[in-house]
Amino acid sequence: MVHYKLMCFDVRGLGEVIRQLFYLGDVSFEDFRVSREEFKSLKSNLPSGQLPVLEIDGVMISQSASIGRFLARQYGYSGKTPTEEMQVDSIIDLFKDFMLTFRQFFFAVIHGYPEYEKERMKRDIVKPAIKNYFIALNKILLRSKSGFLVGDDLTWADLQIADNLSTLINIRLFAEKEPHLNVFIRKL
């Protein structure tokens, strides 16, 4: 029997959707949560020096999108057809592109940048990125007849985007004036 060990920070984050895929697939796994202090000593032993990492029978794999894609294929959440799989991958790439931009602001916050710098980043980087991200997500949802992002069933793109939008709500960067996105979150 395969042994899965998920290593990720002890917060909601890029490991959350991976956890959800394990639960949806009804697959047991070791959920190894790492504090920021513990991460310092683990970092040099990780494939890319980052978390999350999925260890499968002793083999470590990094990069949340690769892990998510693998598990989604294993448990039936990657799309029903090759075209749907490509659409799901496209939405995951949209999320990753947004996160690259958002990450700059996140690091400024956790590393204690001065308020004026965080406000500048929020105005010049984060808000325009969120606007473009929401425009793209709304277009996808408006084309959908099912309320899911792709096809008629839940995919890991739905999980990833819903988790991300929930995080944006929690940190007060989500605009309530996005009716399609709000309906989407409530659906999931």
UniProtKB/Swiss-Prot annotation:
UniProt keyword annotation of Transferase present: yes
- EC class of the enzyme, as a word: transferase
* Any one GO molecular function term: glutathione transferase activity
> What Pfam family is a match for this entry?
GST_C_3
Which SUPFAM superfamilies does the entry mention? GST C-terminal domain-like (SSF47616), Thioredoxin-like (SSF52833)
Report residues binding glutathione.
Answer: K43, G49, Q50, L51, Q63, S64
- Which part of the chain is the GST C-terminal domain? 81-188
Q: What is its EC number?
A: 2.5.1.18
According to the entry, every stretch annotated as the GST N-terminal domain falls at: 2-79
**GO term, biological process aspect, one:** glutathione metabolic process
The UniProt similarity line reads: Belongs to the GST superfamily. Sigma family.
Please identify the protein, giving its name as recorded: Glutathione S-transferase 2
Question: What organism is this sequence from?
Answer: Caenorhabditis elegans
